Each structure stands twice: as structure tokens, then as C-alpha cells.
Amino acid sequence: MAKTQCPLVFSLLALALIGTLQSSAAQCQNSNQFLGSLEITGKYRKAVVSIHNYYRNLTAAGEAGEYYKQPPAENMLQLTWDDDAASKAVELANTCVFGHDGAKDKDDKPMGQNIALKMSSTQSDVNKSYDEWMTGMVKDWFDEVKDYSFGSGFSSGTGHYTQIVWANTSKVGCGYSYYKEGTWYAGYLVCNYKPPGNWYGQDPYIQGNVNCEKHNLGRSKNYNNLCVTKRKKKNNKSGSTQRTNFQEK
């Protein structure tokens, strides 16, 4: 395909539970040309965690959705980064195979998973493409809110959104690769979530104004409408325990 001044760009999304593919740490398990894998640390990690928490906070405040206005959430947790979830996400991203791998954590427990693929006729590189595309990829997942009616149950058409705002999910870890597929240059984002969301018969969160204490949670210092887990802290003098809020660094 000939290049033009306005490069062609398109996106694909896929949702866990639709099907699985085998994954490994190998680079491009097909005819695609591997061009790089981004180590998501520093500003790259902060960006992907922050955009997830932005959308969670927006939803928990009752400000998400237009046609289907979403109710506020009592108990939505602030997400923090998880290295185990990220390492498994990197393995899948590096295969260059667009499909789910039935992700499980180091304890063999299932994880939730969202994947997205964006392609352009113009070459970039792994760092620049992540900077330009990652926010839009996560936004595409979240934008399924337009089709979601709270309490309607799981749907493959809105499952990216419901995983992003699943209240009990507390950890996220992502991987990103960049490769050439035919004449197209592709960025592949994989995010794994712990514990997983999208349980059949369950709503993504408890409806109501934020009430962290009601659910034995602390209030986030970074997001007005999100909660954080409490860690037990032992008092060395008395032997008693106290609870302290755990905040994202």
C-alpha cells in the first residue's frame, strides 16, 4: 500500500473470555517482523496506571456515560501496578499474535485481560507509538460505556469497559510490543487485571456514593472517589494491630 500524507490508522480490540491462544516469551510466533518491546517503567507505567484510575474515578463519581448514565460507586478500588501481571502481559504482546492466552498469575489464578491493536501505514518506533497510541487504546476500551446499561450483566460488547471499572480489581500490569505485519506497523497493548472482573451474574461495583469505610477500605488520597485497601500494622509496644491505608506510590 502506498504511503500518503495522511497515514492510514486503524484499531482492533478483543476481550478475554472469547477464546484463548497459547503464549510464550518468544518474539513473534508468526511471520510478523518484531521491531521492539517496551519496558513499561517510569513515566510509561505511571501513564497507563493513571489513565485507568482516571476512568475508574470518573465512573465512581457517577460521571461516566451519556445515553446510559452510569451510577456512582461505593467501593471502587484505586489500581496499582503488578509486576507479575505485567510480565505475563509482555509474554503475550511479544508473540505478535492478537488473541487471548487465558492469562494466569504466578499462583495459577486467572487474571482479567484486555488487548488492543493499532496499526498504521507509517513507521514509528516502540516508544513513540506507545506515547501516541496507549491513551487512545485504553479510551477505546472505556468508550464501550456508551452501550452499557448498569445491571444488564456481562456482554462481550461492553466487557472491556466493565473490566476497567470492576470495583474489586486492584492490580494492573501491561505489556506493549511494536512489529510489522505485511505493509502495516502495529502496536499491541496487553493489560492483565488482578483479581479478574466480568463475573457472570455480578455487577461491576456496588451502586451508591463513595463509602469506603462501609466496605472496610480507606479513602484514596489521589482520587476523590476511589478507595484503597488497608494494611495491618503491628504496634510493637502493645502487640495490638492497627490498620493503615495503602496508597499508590
From Swiss-Prot:
Subcellular localization: Secreted
Keyword Secreted: yes
Domain SCP stretches: 50-193
A GO cellular component entry from the record: extracellular space
Keywords: Antioxidant, Glycoprotein, Hemostasis impairing toxin, Heparin-binding, Metal-binding, Platelet aggregation inhibiting toxin, Secreted, Signal, Toxin
Keyword Secreted: yes
Cofactor: Cu(2+)
Coiled coil spans: none
Sites carrying sugar chains: N57, N127, N168
Gene3D superfamilies, alphabetized: CAP
Record GO terms (molecular function): antioxidant activity; cupric ion binding; heparan sulfate binding; heparin binding; toxin activity
Principal localisation: secreted
Signal peptide extent: 1-26
Tissues/organs with expression: Saliva (at protein level). Salivary gland (at protein level).
GO process terms (BP): superoxide metabolic process; suppression of platelet aggregation in another organism
Pfam entry (one): CAP
Family in the record: Belongs to the CRISP family. Venom allergen 5-like subfamily.
Further comment: Does not affect blood coagulation. Does not interfere with endothelial cell proliferation. Does not exhibit vasodilation activity. Does not inhibit the complement cascade.
Described function: Antioxidant protein that scavenges superoxide radicals. Removes superoxide radicals produced by PMA-stimulated host neutrophils. Inhibits host platelet aggregation induced by low doses of collagen by interfering with the pro-aggregatory properties of reactive oxygen species on platelets. Binds to heparin and sulfated glycosaminoglycans.
Record's subunit section: Monomeric in solution.
Name assigned to this protein: Salivary antigen-5
Taxonomic classification: Eukaryota, Metazoa, Ecdysozoa, Arthropoda, Hexapoda
